[in-house]
């Protein structure tokens, strides 16, 4: 046993997608940071599907990038099939996504961590927290090492009392071949945190050399791949195609015949899994009338024969999995390299947190990722960045940062978690935001990079790149505002406008669906020199301009309610007229603002009026 004690400003437990962003963010702010993980070689491991981004998720990756996080740049370096989802829909709901080479991704992430000044990787298992005077003061490792710190961030993913299920077999593990985190689960239990159980699953991995690719429909990468990071000029990694197949009636019959052997239906698992990523057993039971379910065969790397069959997550016994695979077109002779499985794990009710991701119960302790009830690499990365940033600011005695719903999907996600809690793994969608016209992938840097610079987590390279980009955008916008046409002049160029005699600027012309940048460049040739990314951004701004003006009124009202602070020590029992039901609901969340109180399910307008009056009286007394 070791008895050494080392001092850091911030300790991050876990080297997954939340952990690396937390550690890197804390170090960027200037905190002396330790990243504690079982093995350094597993940092950045993609435990489930080899992909980054998607609908809603791509927005989070862009926001992490805007705050100088790692995920976007690493995904750009490792991406092997870039596709922009929802390309035919409006810009606000488009989602960049890429398949990633699993090995390339981990190597690139490990290199990024190694190159981060002030960040030390410590191999070991965090077994307990050091608590002094009612607040976290460090972490104890299983081998006896004592790490002192001003703040600790826990990002244990599925490791917290993790239990793998394959048919009737149960294997204690955080993921295949790795031990679960039992000590920290006991620690959180001991300190009174509300813990629950969730589950997720993964499909069997296939040997791509035994797949009949000629029998499959192929899905190719975009010809013009869109990077995640604004710092990435172009994608240089070779791009590959994925195969598409479907389940068959024979597959469905096999599943129905063996449902009693699936832990989700035998009683082996009672916890809930992700609604939007159901197992193949759930799909067959819930959508029994369908003839087949789509499966995407996603290669896990350029030099790796392993294929991830996206769409058939399962925990059925291995022999049943083999039968299922053999009954799928193109996979009749395919070899399974590793069986699919379900995994149960502990999570902390996220209503135990405030909007900074610090726990209310234990100051100095921050939580991020699946431990907060979310699912997905991108959700984890976003939380990790916010938690690491705030842990560093707490250790440095600076004011903590809150990202609100009107400025970012990060704010939407965190507010959803800490206000509503979860009953199933939380996944980000654009539909979760009431301000999604403003929260687009193309303006994430404009929304968040200046904020990140003020908070100290944006480095000089990104700051300089952002300044140059904004300068070019402003110059192009000014040029559009100085160019104009009358309806008659427009008609001479083949543009049909209302003959009202009013001049319209080039920016206003862009708001017409039939007028694109190419049409304007034909009229004013110097516009052809504007970089495509800036031209596309200005076209989007013009398209949404009238709607954004209306939305700004909603945002102003939102910010007005968010400005009404509710004291952390507020005793709801002292507010006359507040019903017992309202007191219980409010006490369960302990909202920090009137706006957050309004978002608690079941809180009535009458209760909000009483809260607002109480807050006003408190301000009056404080200034008297």
Swiss-Prot record:
Keyword annotations: Cytoplasm, FAD, Flavoprotein, NAD, tRNA processing
Sites where the protein binds FAD: 14-19
Signal sequence coordinates: none
GO cellular component: cytosol
Coiled-coil parts of chain: none
Keyword Amino-acid biosynthesis among UniProt keywords: no
Cofactor(s) needed by this chain: FAD
GO MF annotations in UniProt: flavin adenine dinucleotide binding
Cytoplasm found in the keyword field: yes
Gene Ontology biological process terms from the UniProt entry: tRNA methylation; tRNA wobble uridine modification
Cited PROSITE patterns: GIDA_1, GIDA_2
Location in the cell: Cytoplasm
Pfam families the UniProt entry points to: GIDA, GIDA_C_1st, SAM_GIDA_C
Positions bound to NAD(+): 273-287
SUPFAM superfamilies per the UniProt record, alphabetical: FAD/NAD(P)-binding domain
UniProt subunit comment: Homodimer. Heterotetramer of two MnmE and two MnmG subunits.
HAMAP family recorded: MnmG_GidA
Family per similarity comment: Belongs to the MnmG family.
Function: NAD-binding protein involved in the addition of a carboxymethylaminomethyl (cmnm) group at the wobble position (U34) of certain tRNAs, forming tRNA-cmnm(5)s(2)U34.
Protein name: tRNA uridine 5-carboxymethylaminomethyl modification enzyme MnmG
Lineage of the organism: Bacteria, Pseudomonadati, Pseudomonadota, Alphaproteobacteria, Hyphomicrobiales
């Amino acid at each position: 046993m070791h008895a050494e004690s080392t001092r850091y400003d911030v300790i991050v437990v876990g080297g997954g997608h939340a952990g690396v962003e937390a550690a890197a963010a804390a170090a960027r702010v200037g905190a002396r940071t330790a990243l504690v993980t079982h093995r350094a070689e597993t940092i950045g491991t993609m435990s489930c599907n080899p992909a980054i981004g998607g609908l809603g998720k791509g927005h989070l990756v862009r926001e992490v990038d805007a705050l100088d996080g790692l995920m976007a740049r690493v995904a750009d370096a490792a991406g092997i099939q870039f596709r922009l989802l929802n390309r035919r829909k409006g810009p606000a709901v488009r989602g960049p996504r890429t398949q990633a080479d699993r090995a390339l991704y981990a190597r690139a992430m490990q290199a990024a961590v190694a190159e981060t000044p002030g960040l030390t990787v410590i191999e070991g298992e965090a077994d307990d927290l050091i608590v002094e005077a009612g607040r976290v003061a460090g972490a104890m490792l299983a081998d006896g090492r004592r790490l002192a710190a001003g703040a600790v961030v826990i990002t244990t993913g599925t490791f917290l009392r993790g239990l793998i299920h394959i048919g009737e077999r149960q294997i204690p593990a955080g993921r295949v071949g790795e031990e679960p985190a039992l000590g920290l689960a006991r620690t959180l239990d001991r300190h009174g945190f509300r813990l629950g159980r969730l589950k997720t699953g993964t499909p069997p991995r296939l040997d791509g050399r035994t797949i009949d690719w000629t029998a499959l429909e192929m899905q190719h990468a975009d010809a013009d791949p869109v990077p995640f990071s604004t710092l990435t000029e172009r994608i240089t990694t070779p791009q590959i195609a994925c195969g598409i197949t479907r389940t068959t009636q024979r597959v469905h019959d096999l599943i129905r015949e063996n449902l009693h052997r699936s832990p989700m239906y035998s009683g082996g698992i009672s916890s809930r899994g992700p609604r939007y990523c159901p197992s193949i057993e759930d799909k067959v039971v819930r959508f029994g009338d369908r003839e087949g379910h789509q499966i995407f065969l996603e290669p896990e790397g350029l030099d790796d024969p392993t294929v991830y069959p996206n769409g058939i997550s399962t925990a059925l016994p291995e022999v049943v999995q083999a039968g299922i695979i053999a009954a799928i077109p193109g996979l009749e002779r395919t070899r399974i390299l590793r069986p699919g499985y379900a995994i149960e794990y502990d999570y902390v009710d996220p209503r135990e947190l405030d909007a900074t991701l610090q726990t209310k119960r234990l100051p100095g302790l921050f939580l991020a990722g699946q431990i907060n009830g979310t699912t997905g690499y991108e959700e984890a990365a976003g939380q990790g960045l916010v938690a690491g940033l705030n842990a560093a600011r707490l250790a440095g005695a600076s004011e903590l940062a809150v990202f609100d719903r009107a400025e970012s999907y990060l704010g939407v996600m965190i507010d959803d978690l800490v206000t509503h809690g979860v009953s199933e793994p939380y996944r980000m969608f654009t539909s979760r935001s009431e301000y999604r016209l403003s929260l687009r992938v193309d303006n994430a840097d404009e929304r968040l990079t200046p904020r990140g610079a003020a908070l100290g987590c944006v480095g000089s390279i990104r700051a300089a790149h952002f300044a140059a980009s904004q300068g070019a955008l402003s110059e192009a916008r000014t040029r559009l505002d100085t160019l104009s046409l009358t309806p008659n002049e427009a008609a001479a160029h083949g543009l049909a406008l209302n003959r009202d005699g009013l001049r319209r600027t080039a920016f206003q012309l862009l708001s017409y669906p039939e007028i694109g940048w190419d049409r304007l460049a034909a009229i004013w040739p110097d516009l052809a020199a504007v970089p495509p990314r800036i031209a596309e951004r200005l076209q989007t701004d013009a398209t949404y301009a009238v709607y954004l003006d209306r939305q700004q009124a909603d945002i102003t009202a939102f910010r007005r309610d968010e400005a009404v602070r509710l004291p952390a020590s507020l005793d709801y029992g002292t507010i006359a007229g507040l019903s017992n039901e309202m007191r219980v609901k409010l006490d369960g969340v302990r909202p920090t603002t009137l706006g957050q109180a309004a978002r608690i399910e079941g809180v009535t307008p009458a209760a909000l009026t009483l809260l607002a009056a109480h807050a006003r009286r408190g301000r009056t007394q404080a200034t008297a």
